[in-house]
Amino acid sequence: MALTSEQRAEIEAQRSEPQLTSRPTVAAMENLLFTPFEVLDHGFLRVVDYMGDDGAVVQAARVSYGRGTKKVSEDAGLIRYLMRHRHSTPFEMCEIKFHVKLPVFVARQWIRHRMASVNEYSARYSILDREFYLPAMDQVAAQSSSNRQGRSDALDADTAHQVLEILRRDASQCYDDYESLLNPEGRGLARELARINLTLNTYTQWYWKIDLHNLMHFLALRADPHAQYEIRVYAEKMIEILKAWVPATAAAFEEYRLGAFTLSAGMLKVVRRRLAGETVTQENSGLTKREWSEMAAVLDGAS
């Protein structure tokens, strides 16, 4: 992970000057505030601010003036109810802001989640660093034959080395050309034009602020095993932060979203028929092959 000297100085300054506040704070979050967590080869993720806690969710749900009940178990029970019944607005009362360094191709997946505020490092005004994402050997994988947007098994070592060399060579050459285009003693091309030649594995940075409800939606999709590895590792780190920030909400989220599976009306009929002792197959279930395999993977542990 490469932090600039300016970023390190900023982090140290922020951590050395605690702020007085009357608002609720979370001790675990205060301890990790501003701390960069390494992700991928040059990326990082750090919390720069947050608002609210589990108590804020409860307070909003009850529209109360206090901080919830005196019994943590009652507050946790209400949060579980809200999560189970897919209430959203109480969770929207909490917000968190991240500083993220990530490859451009990951950023383009990430930005599809539109319910957030984002401000990205501008290559129109500044020059991007010579930093590129190169996957680890075990992540250099073949295209999946069953999933058009997924990968399969890792390639053999020799092929993986060749792939990595191509990625490294192309990224380096494009950055050399980027510098050459920018050189005021040479072509002196505008930054907003010179950047278009850079590869998608170039690292960018942004500040990303989102409410708790939409954060959990993001995590449910991007921490899923089917999500691309390079964005999933960011989501997994964010789940660790979620547990420190709102532990009761995080527990309910894991119970009712991450570790859960939604049955369609047709799937529920199949379950009831099986409970009644009927032998149900995909052919007589009324489900498509994909629906059947997804349900079987959950109910029977089959693929």
From Swiss-Prot:
The keyword Iron does not apply. Keywords: FAD, Flavoprotein, Methyltransferase, NADP, Nucleotide biosynthesis, Transferase. It catalyses: dUMP + (6R)-5,10-methylene-5,6,7,8-tetrahydrofolate + NADPH + H(+) = dTMP + (6S)-5,6,7,8-tetrahydrofolate + NADP(+). Its EC number is 2.1.1.148. The active site is at R222 (involved in ionization of n3 of dump, leading to its activation). A motif (ThyX motif) lies at residues 112-122. Residues 43-256 form the ThyX domain. Signal peptide: none annotated. Pathway: Pyrimidine metabolism; dTTP biosynthesis. It holds the Pfam family Thy1. Its cofactor is FAD. InterPro entries: Thymidylate_synthase_ThyX, Thymidylate_synthase_ThyX_sf. One of its GO terms (biological process) is dTTP biosynthetic process. Homotetramer. Catalyzes the reductive methylation of 2'-deoxyuridine-5'-monophosphate (dUMP) to 2'-deoxythymidine-5'-monophosphate (dTMP) while utilizing 5,10-methylenetetrahydrofolate (mTHF) as the methyl donor, and NADPH and FADH(2) as the reductant. This is Flavin-dependent thymidylate synthase. It comes from Gluconobacter oxydans (strain 621H). The lineage of its organism: Bacteria, Pseudomonadati, Pseudomonadota, Alphaproteobacteria, Acetobacterales.
